[in-house]
From Swiss-Prot:
Purpose of the protein: One of the primary rRNA binding proteins. Required for association of the 30S and 50S subunits to form the 70S ribosome, for tRNA binding and peptide bond formation. It has been suggested to have peptidyltransferase activity; this is somewhat controversial. Makes several contacts with the 16S rRNA in the 70S ribosome.
Gene: rplB
PROSITE patterns per the UniProt record, alphabetical: RIBOSOMAL_L2 (PS00467)
Pfam families reported in the protein's UniProt record: Ribosomal_L2, Ribosomal_L2_C
Region Disordered, annotated ranges: 222-278
GO biological process annotation, one example: cytoplasmic translation
A Gene Ontology cellular-component term: large ribosomal subunit
PANTHER family in the record: LARGE RIBOSOMAL SUBUNIT PROTEIN UL2M (PTHR13691:SF5), RIBOSOMAL PROTEIN L2 (PTHR13691)
Keywords: Ribonucleoprotein, Ribosomal protein, RNA-binding, rRNA-binding
Matches recorded under InterPro entries: NA-bd_OB-fold, Rib_uL2_dom2, Ribosomal_uL2, Ribosomal_uL2_bac/org-type, Ribosomal_uL2_C, Ribosomal_uL2_CS, Ribosomal_uL2_dom3, Ribosomal_uL2_RNA-bd_dom
Comp. bias regions, Basic residues: 269-278
Family (UniProt): Belongs to the universal ribosomal protein uL2 family.
UniProt keyword Ubl conjugation present: no
Protein's recorded name: Large ribosomal subunit protein uL2
């Protein structure tokens, strides 16, 4: 899909760049596949802020997207492509031959009327899902599971994809966009193709108000706060902070490694940080 630019009739329109969504469905979503979505405003069950800079935004309905693709050997036809406010990718409404409907992530080059299927072995075409042991090496994939039957977790956002680079001893080796090379079980499901809406990274909202519509609030720098609020706060006039950048809780930020899950380190063949070391 192409990008839309606008005539500078106001400061908020001058820099505005949006994705052209004219080819997407213009009506309401499939009623049986949506749920209400309560706004949390970044608060947990105790009412305390656990995610800062969240709040407000337009009301949304949550679309129930099928990330598991476990309806085997049942062809489905793509009824339409839709916008989903809860994610950067577009979604596709599919209808199985037995009449059941579902939402799936729409890959690139999938269009209305196409047929998709999930099977133990099927054609390598966008939207088809199969276990990694049946996928030819070199294939571009998205919505990849990390554990069998858990549902896709890797490469789900707009334009994302991974590449299958090899198989060995019950594991598949995939290369992520970050440069990381990791192993996952070859029983894990993956969907062929790259995720739709690759132009998402070129969007320019043009004004703060559009970010507020998305539920994002302003970000306040620690250096302009008081000492009670942030380690960088205080001082007469503008100060540099006097220490390496830290979070409000004193943890190093800007590049400090935060990964703690040692039990799954064995599945990472090459870290995404190794390119930076060279």
């Amino acid at each position: 899909m192409a990008l839309k630019t606008f005539k500078p009739t106001s400061p908020g329109r001058r820099a505005l760049v949006l994705v052209d969504r004219s080819a997407l469905h213009k009506g309401r979503p499939e009623k049986t596949l949506v749920e209400g979505l309560t706004k949390k405003g970044g608060r947990n069950n105790m009412g305390r802020i656990t995610a800062r800079r969240r709040g407000g935004g337009a009301k949304r309905l949550y679309r129930l997207v099928d990330f598991k693709r476990r309806k085997w050997d049942m062809p489905a036809t793509v009824e339409r492509l839709e916008y989903d406010p809860n994610r950067t990718a577009f979604i596709a409404l599919i209808k199985y031959e037995d009449g059941e409907k579902a939402y799936i992530l729409a890959p690139q080059r999938l269009s209305e009327g196409d047929t998709v299927i999930a099977s133990a072995k099927c054609d390598v075409k966008p939207g088809n899902a199969m276990p990694l042991k049946a996928v030819p090496v070199g294939t571009i994939l998205h919505n990849v599971e990390m554990k069998p039957e858990k549902g896709g977790q890797i490469a789900r956002s707009a334009g994302a994809y991974v590449q299958l680079v090899g198989r060995d001893a019950g594991y598949a080796q995939i290369r992520l966009a970050s440069g990381e090379l990791r192993m996952v079980s070859d029983k894990c499901m993956a969907t062929v193709g790259a995720v739709s809406n690759p132009d998402h990274l070129n969007i320019n909202l043009g004004k703060a108000g559009r970010n507020r519509h998305l539920g994002k609030r302003p970000s306040v720098r620690g250096v302009v706060m008081n000492p009670v609020d942030h380690p960088h706060g205080g001082g007469e006039g503008r100060t540099s902070g006097g220490r390496h950048p830290v979070t409000p809780w004193g943890k190093p930020t800007k590049g400090a490694k935060t990964r703690k899950n040692k039990s799954t380190d064995k599945f990472i063949i090459r870290s995404r940080h190794e390119r930076k070391k060279r």
